[in-house]
């Protein structure tokens, strides 16, 4: 079963903790609005594998675009990171995880 997110804020915190623990550097793009509890909203991007410019293949996996699907999408990203497979990528491959393309929609 896919472990869905309970809400945007806990999903984002878990995403950031998990991908950083797995060795990724995260780039965050802040949204100008705030979430329902006044929390910061951001689209967070984590990259694994080959650095920019060195990858022959890049796989982009988004948790979702509109918002509501972000709950299940984060669950899939979580399963992938926890599987350990991102640590065994070929040298020419990169995987980019995008958490919450639309953090406003995800949060509300």
List each language-model region with its residue ranges.
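Structured catalytic-domain cores with a bias toward divalent-metal coordination
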Residues: 1-108
């Amino acid at each position: 079963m896919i472990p869905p997110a309970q809400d945007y804020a806990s999903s984002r915190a878990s995403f950031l903790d998990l991908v950083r623990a797995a060795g990724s550097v995260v780039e965050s793009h802040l949204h100008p609005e705030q979430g329902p509890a006044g929390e910061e909203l951001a689209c967070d991007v984590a990259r694994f594998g080959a650095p920019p410019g060195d990858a022959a293949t890049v796989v982009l996996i988004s948790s979702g675009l509109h918002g509501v699907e972000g709950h299940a999408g984060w669950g899939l990203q979580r399963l992938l990171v926890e599987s350990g497979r991102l640590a065994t990528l070929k040298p020419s491959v990169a995987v980019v995880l995008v958490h919450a393309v639309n953090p406003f929609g995800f949060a509300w």
